[in-house]
């Protein structure tokens, strides 16, 4: 009997349909909220830092896009902006900062040096931070214009909104045989 039913589609019950519908609404709502509340952690190492400060100034106003308040603790941030060149001695530090960030977390490679090592093609420079940590958005330029950075933030916002977000990740509790009282 079970082998006859293996190829048939499983029909969802009303409760499963309701839970799926509710999860879809929660996911869309969380995606919308998260895309406008990015808490950045700037990892600034080189000359692109000047353009990072320009991007955060009143003229370009990154606050409009929800990325205004830089955090100086990775535990309070969800967007790591790697700004500039990363050398091999800094690589473990960058990886540790990434691991300290709470989930969900995103990474932006700010400038050519962070994206591909730039013109520092030598043994001491990491040829792109994607060799150390996963990168969500690459912003080109040496240094990138503030408009390019804001475009990168908008691309990241689209990515965040289209991701699946869960309010609570429920996992079944383990059953312990012969526990207390048995």
From Swiss-Prot:
Catalytic activity annotation: a quinone + NADH + 5 H(+)(in) = a quinol + NAD(+) + 4 H(+)(out)
Binding-site residues for [4Fe-4S] cluster, renumbered to this chain: 47-48, 113, 142
UniProt keyword Lipid metabolism, yes or no: no
Keyword Cell membrane: yes
Domain of life (superkingdom): Bacteria
Membrane topology qualifier: Peripheral membrane protein
GO CC terms, sorted: plasma membrane; respiratory chain complex I
Subcellular localization, as worded in the UniProt entry: Cell inner membrane
Subunit structure: NDH-1 is composed of 14 different subunits. Subunits NuoB, C, D, E, F, and G constitute the peripheral sector of the complex.
PANTHER family from the UniProt entry: NADH DEHYDROGENASE, NADH DEHYDROGENASE [UBIQUINONE] IRON-SULFUR PROTEIN 7, MITOCHONDRIAL
Function statement: NDH-1 shuttles electrons from NADH, via FMN and iron-sulfur (Fe-S) centers, to quinones in the respiratory chain. Couples the redox reaction to proton translocation (for every two electrons transferred, four hydrogen ions are translocated across the cytoplasmic membrane), and thus conserves the redox energy in a proton gradient.
Family: Belongs to the complex I 20 kDa subunit family.
Protein name: NADH-quinone oxidoreductase subunit B 1
Species assigned in the record: Anaeromyxobacter dehalogenans (strain 2CP-C)
């Amino acid at each position: 009997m079970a082998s006859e039913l293996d190829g048939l589609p499983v029909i969802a019950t009303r409760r499963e349909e309701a839970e799926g519908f509710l999860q879809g609404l929660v996911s869309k709502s969380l995606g919308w909220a998260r895309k406008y509340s990015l808490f950045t952690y700037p990892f600034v190492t080189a000359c692109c830092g000047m353009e990072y400060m320009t991007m955060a100034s009143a003229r370009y106003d990154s606050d409009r896009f929800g990325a205004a308040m830089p955090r100086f603790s990775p535990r309070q941030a969800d967007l790591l902006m790697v700004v500039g060149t990363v050398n091999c001695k800094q690589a473990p530090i960058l990886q540790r900062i990434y691991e300290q960030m709470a989930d969900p977390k995103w990474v932006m490679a700010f400038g050519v040096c962070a994206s591909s090592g730039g013109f520092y093609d030598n043994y001491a420079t990491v040829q792109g931070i994607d060799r150390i940590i996963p990168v969500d958005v690459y912003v080109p330029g040496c240094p990138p214009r503030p408009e390019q950075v804001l475009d990168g933030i908008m691309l990241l916002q689209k990515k965040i909104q289209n991701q699946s977000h869960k309010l609570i990740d429920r996992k079944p509790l383990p059953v312990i045989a012969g526990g207390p009282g048995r």
